[in-house]
Amino acid sequence: MREQLTALKHEALDKAEVAKSEQDIQAIRVAYLGKKGPITEVLRGMGKLSAEERPIIGALANEVRDEIKNKLDEKSKKLQEAAIKQQLEQESIDVTLPGRPALQGAIHPLTAVVTEIEEIFLGLGFSIGEGPEIETDYYNFEAMNLPKDHPARDMQDSFYVTEDLLLRTQTSPVQARTMEKFAGKGPVKVVVPGKVFRRDDDDATHSHQFMQVEGLYVDKKVRMSDLKGVLETFAKQFFGQDRSIRLRPSFFPFTEPSVEVDVSCGICSGKGCRVCKQSGWIEVLGAGMVHPRVLEMSGFDANEYSGFAFGMGVERLAMLKYDIDDIRQFYANDLRFLMQFKDV
């Protein structure tokens, strides 16, 4: 048996040395060390040996088995290293190629528009205010001269949270909250950007959620001409120095008198086109002189103080400025649309 084991060892080691792949190594391992291999057969036949030969042959068989196993493991490692080296040579990286830049995001167009509006009014001496999006019925309606039985309430379908709380339908409630903080002493000069909510069906020009910027200026001897001057300055800085505005009579419960504000069409320079419906003007916001009752409810003496207020839809301004025809694009999270404003 000694000669048989020695012969098996040399035979297995020679085959391992010339093995070309992992498959060859596995085949040798099964052939010589497997359950049906010759070394296993030798170990099974040890029962026929004498008591003196049994430990000697057993030790030799284990030694041969370990030597073959170690040789196969060593050869397998070399083959793996050679395969990795070959793969690296074939898949070498050209480090001279320029890297791929990381994808950079962009400011959302509505954020960019709000920021621009804020900067314009900060330059005009206004401060930035804010108020709650879940508002009380009092501040959203009554403080804005809309009592519970006022017919104008039917014009706005609202999202009520409780009987007395609702998602604000306008940023106007911040007018009352801000004036209350000043305790009847002016001047009050603030713009308030924020989200508002109405039960509108979403389409190309309507959304159940949109953004407004509210403006308020209260002081002694504030006049309608002050309102026009501020809004004309805003229009020229926002749309371009060649633009002008006009005021049309309108009605809002919280202002008296009230006006709709149009800006001259930038497509046709006021001559008339499809965009402005041949009028030369495009409606952009509502405004007016603060109603005396709103001043009184907020703690100001309407005989001593006056003021103006205005409200503009951010999405509408953005659509006009960037020639966007569908308000839903602002909220679709489509990168193809949003990345167009990367340099805005």
Swiss-Prot record:
SUPFAM superfamilies: Class II aaRS and biotin synthetases, tRNA-binding arm. CDD domains: PheRS_alpha_core. Mg(2+) binds at E256. GO terms for biological process: phenylalanyl-tRNA aminoacylation. Transmembrane segments: none annotated. GO terms for molecular function: ATP binding; catalytic activity, acting on a protein; magnesium ion binding; phenylalanine-tRNA ligase activity; transferase activity; tRNA binding. Its EC number is 6.1.1.20. It is found in: Cytoplasm. Belongs to the class-II aminoacyl-tRNA synthetase family. Phe-tRNA synthetase alpha subunit type 1 subfamily. Tetramer of two alpha and two beta subunits. This is Phenylalanine--tRNA ligase alpha subunit.
